[in-house]
Amino acid sequence: VSTRAVYSSSPNDYKYTNHDKKINIYDEEKNIIGQYHPKERNRSGSFKDLHLLQEVYYNTLKGDRFGLNAWYINSNRELPMLTTDYGDATDFENRQREQTFRSVLSWDHIKSNWKLGVKGGYIHTWMAYDYKREVAPDNWASMTRSRSKVNTFYGQAEGEYSPTKRWFFTANVSAHQHLVRSEDKNIILQDGGKAIVGYDKGRVELSGSVSAKWQPIDRLGMSVVLREEMYGSEWAPLISAFFIDGIISPKGNVMLKASVSRNYRFPTLNDLYFLPGGNPNLRNEHGFSYDAGVSFEVGKENAYKLSGGANWFDSYIDDWII
């Protein structure tokens, strides 16, 4: 059993020289005769964070381990103004608040050459962003009142199996149910007479993968990964990857490595619907990535060590989601 609590805070109130601004110096005829960087004071970067973590584990001493983990976060942070903003920081409030609770139940079964694990959990996040401006003394106008609630239920199962020292297999399957409501209470859009405030959506996400690693000799290893995903009701094509690495010279521990992988990514709910900036017509991102590299390491024990490497990578992506 383990219980941890962390609390941190800071007013972040300090003076600094703003090198992103320049103030002109004028003569009596309004000619610029010089410039200087102003000294300013940051008054809008305070934060208060509380983190709680509770862990409970039970080991049967027969290869089974059960666990319960729970996290809680309470955060209240001011967001500082840009250093190029010429407004008065005391006239604005830019604040983000968050409360997140995460819980996980787990079971692991471990044997000499295989392992099985199952997890299930729930995540709740409430997040608020407020942007206010003082339009008159003690009279604040709310420009943005963003509120988001995210509820996620998930389950995961994974396994590992090593029949010999030359082969290693893994498998993983997971399921997530996301329920998201995001809104700006200051903005109401109309769509055919129906009020839409941000978005209120849910989506099921499934993912499964298998991998095999083969080490024919001590200095060479190869692995293949196959993955399949489903978002909502749409399945991705089979996503594959191949990796290879080998030591070409034990002297200097010179190693070559390379990989090729297929990329496929569905847009997130924020990519599709978040206001402003969401695009419900986004297409799925897809492409291929390649990389190769070489590394070395030389040295003398308890005296010195020198290591280095060089890498090359290239990607071809269509419908890239930025």
Predicted regions span which residues?
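Residues on the lipid-exposed face of transmembrane beta-strands in outer-membrane beta-barrel proteins
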Residues: V1, L52-Y58, S103-H109, G155-Y161, ...
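Transmembrane beta-barrel wall of Gram-negative outer-membrane proteins
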Residues: V1-S9, K22-N76, Q99-K111, P163-F169, ...
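Transmembrane beta-strands of outer-membrane beta-barrel pores
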Residues: Y7-P11, Y72-N76, K111, Y122-W126, ...
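Flexible loop and strand-edge segments within Gram-negative outer membrane beta-barrel domains
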Residues: S10-Y14, R43-D49, G63-L116, Y122-V150
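Outer-membrane beta-barrel translocator domains and adjoining extracellular loop/strand segments
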Residues: Y14-D20, A70-I73, E78-G87, A128-D138, ...
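Outer-membrane beta-barrel channels and translocator barrels
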Residues: N59-G63, I110-W114, S162-R166, Q215-G221, ...
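Outer-membrane beta-barrel signature, preferentially recognizing the C-terminal barrel domain
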Residues: D91-I110, E234, I248-S249, M255, ...
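Outer-membrane beta-barrel transmembrane domain signature of Gram-negative proteins
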Residues: R95-T100, I110, Y122-H124, D130-S223
